[in-house]
Amino acid sequence: MNPIVINRLQRKLGYTFRQHDLLMQALTHRSASSKHNERLEFLGDSILSFVIANALYHRFPRVDEGDMSRMRATLVRGNTLAEMAREFDLGECLRLGPGELKSGGFRRESILADTVEALIGGIFLDSDIQTIERLILDWYRSRLEEISPGDKQKDPKTRLQEFLQGRHLPLPSYLVVQVRGEAHDQEFTIHCQVSGLSAPVVGVGSSRRKAEQAAAEQALKQLELE
């Protein structure tokens, strides 16, 4: 991989790896190699959840568990991580197999989000918990400053359902219209039919649940509630 691209990524992350192989593994999708990033992703997911939970606990001393859980879910969900990955220009650094390259995997939200988590796991193993906590809080500084408790933190499906129920309208229906990929790396496409919208809304995700949430989020935008 181009060392200029890798060095640019490390500058954006604010961290230079001592163990180059950990960085390469974090950037490697399972379609490209048997030494892929899924174990690092597992580790990074847990570390991210802890760091954000700890930050919210101290930032909002009077907020209850439910609101803190919703705020954490907002901050660690896939589209937030994918947004962060795009800020790092992570797509140009991914190591993908031929099939994923051909299908535009370097733009896919689920792959981008998973790679951010893998990088978190890799940085932790390359350094220590204090270093990765400092980095995560730096990456999340503006998002932590902007977030606040309240209904906005409820997941999109819940907000869409409550909106429709409040107007005595039928609940949305979700239909799986396509499933792509192997069992370990699937992509679901969902059509969501909502009263008041003339055509089904489309959502895509790495699981049925994530695709339904993505569709509900698009529906909220079309209903001008986002």
UniProtKB/Swiss-Prot annotation:
Its EC number is 3.1.26.3. The keyword RNA-binding applies. GO terms for cellular component: cytoplasm. Its cofactor is Mg(2+). It is an enzyme of class 3 (hydrolase). Coiled coil: none annotated. Keywords: Cytoplasm, Endonuclease, Hydrolase, Magnesium, Metal-binding, mRNA processing, Nuclease, RNA-binding, rRNA processing, rRNA-binding, tRNA processing. It is found in: Cytoplasm. One of its GO terms (molecular function) is rRNA binding. Residues 155-225 form the DRBM domain. Mg(2+) binds at E41, D114, E117. One of its GO terms (biological process) is mRNA processing. The active site is at D45, E117. The keyword Protein biosynthesis does not apply. Belongs to the ribonuclease III family. Homodimer. This is Ribonuclease 3. It comes from Edwardsiella ictaluri (strain 93-146).
